[in-house]
Amino acid sequence: TALAGCSNHEGESTAPKSELNVMSYNIRYANASDKGDAAWDARKEASVTMIHDVKPDVIGMQEPRFSQAQYLIGELTEYEHYYLAPDDKDSQHRNAVWWRKDRFEMLAQGYFFLNEKDITQPIKGWGHNQFRTALWVKLRERSTGKEFFFFNTHLAHRASPVEGGDIDQVARTESVKLIVEQMKQIAGRYAPIFVTGDMNASYAAGDGRRTCLDGFFEFMWSARETAPDGEADDVYSYN
């Protein structure tokens, strides 16, 4: 999922628009139990080929383990990256942002945890069984001097109903609210902002899970809806 905007209300910039090719990519963490075509060793060359073919300007990536990140660093030499590894385990709770180093320079970076207690600590939020994170970078386009913020996240997924509702839906909804609050504090209300992520929520109209993204849609525009015709699709693939 990719969303973008300054704000969904007043304050829209009148500056000339620049094109930005953005990719959100859950790479599927390298799991020893994945066999055959699902194994990372079977997928890694195709992953690099796909990125080289699509040529995204910025990538929001979810789940790259250390070994995967090291491989990609060696192969994606045209990109710089910010790789978030907030624990000392080689877990799937790792996110990254990649950007074309010939086009952009990074001005700032940071991250926070998605929970209701202390966003500086790896606390499991809203009764969930895993901690989740969001990371961000501030980039400047070298040719124009334009600056923007890019956030990337991976929202809750467990599919465990609890009394009073789905704990996943609660965690996703509250996480989105928190991310939007942090966007406003870090970037301000009218700075250009992009957010990508594995939202673990359906985009389909009428699907109740979509409501957890309301906080994003109230603050931003959907890049899917504003993309040129034919450049956004609903094709599923295996990482």
Task: Annotate each PLM feature.
Residues 81-100, 116-119, 125-131, 190-193, ...:
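Active site of divalent-metal-dependent phosphoester/diester hydrolases
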Residues 24-45, 114-129, 156-171:
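Acidic/histidine-rich helix-loop elements
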Residues 52-56, 69, 73-78, 103, ...:
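Sec-exported extracytoplasmic/periplasmic mature domains
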Residues 133-153, 165-209:
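His/acidic metal-ligating clusters that form di-metal
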Residues 3-75, 87-93, 177:
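N-terminal, active-site-proximal structural segment of metallo-dependent hydrolase catalytic domains
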Residues 29-31, 64-69, 157-161, 200-210, ...:
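Active-site environment of divalent metal-dependent phosphoester hydrolases
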Residues 58-155:
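Structured beta-strand-rich core segments of catalytic domains in phosphoester-bond hydrolases
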Residues 17-21, 54-58, 77-81, 144-149, ...:
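Loop/turn elements at helix/coil->beta-strand transitions in domains of secreted/extracellular proteins
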